[in-house]
Amino acid sequence: VNVLWLQSGGCGGCSMSLLCADTADFPGMLKAGGIELLWHPSLSLASGRELITLLEDCRDGRQKLDVLCVEGSLLRGPNGTGRFHLLAGTGVPMIDWVRGLAAVATHVVAVGSCAAWGGITATGPNVTEACGLQYDGDRPGGLLGAGFTARGGLPVINVAGCPTHPGWVVDTLMALAANLFGSEDLDPLNRPRFYADQLVHHGCTRNEYYEFKASAEKPSDLGCMMENMGCKGTQAHADCNTRLWNGEGSCTRGGYACISCTEPGFQDPGHPYHQTPKLAGIPIGLPTDMPKARFVALASLSKSATPKRVKSNATADHVVVAPAVKKTRLK
């Protein structure tokens, strides 16, 4: 399976993350999966006329293109011309190259939230007219249009995240190479379900604090960050706390609130990332699938039953009260 990777309007963070894939032999891993990387801006030597010839060959059908990966948002400005971002040496807007290559690719993959929805590049007034491949924020459309399907029959596969976990990208490419990826493997936002059917909350090491609604009050506190610190882990679709980053970490494990970076529009939440917006003292963003009345009732009951150990540790930066030592055997 031939893979062509292009970078558009973004920081390159998804590529940097990919280079941290949990393997000692990244090229060997791709080869074992039957993946040939035609070109990647950080991993390939080709440039100038050699690269342009490759892109022309892919676009014109002389080189088979199985998977087109696009990293970074698509810059349509000014006034829809795309001339804010010209591919070096061609004088042609990147959006025109992407349209032409997407039309002949068997599959198209948006790598990261910028390529999927517009992401950070589309923040605020969006003067660059940035959008995703098939979404403009949470609205279907984007550069290629809501009705786009690649030659393989699938819409754009949105491997969203800022940045993406290297495993999300590699697993997607491996599944495509093995012909084991179909429409049933996409969630309603066309994200791969193998990671999007989970919540960041799943596997969070702060779950005991969440269960008792023992909340952190400031950075470095051990407690749950949902109530006060802006954490959206109970709403964000990703497997960050079960897959982990570099085999051992995640945002919440590092003491940072989840900002739901796999979600369209995460870059403009309408409030500071580190604060939880509330109405009458109740967080506006309640856990996925949790009715407000039930959450309020559960929170009240949980707080009334909070052990002293959990309550004390929640607002400390280290364990101040250790679990009691008790016999667990029946006799």
Residue spans for each PLM region:
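Long, compositionally biased charged/polar accessory segments in the mid-to-C-terminal portions
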Residues: 197-325
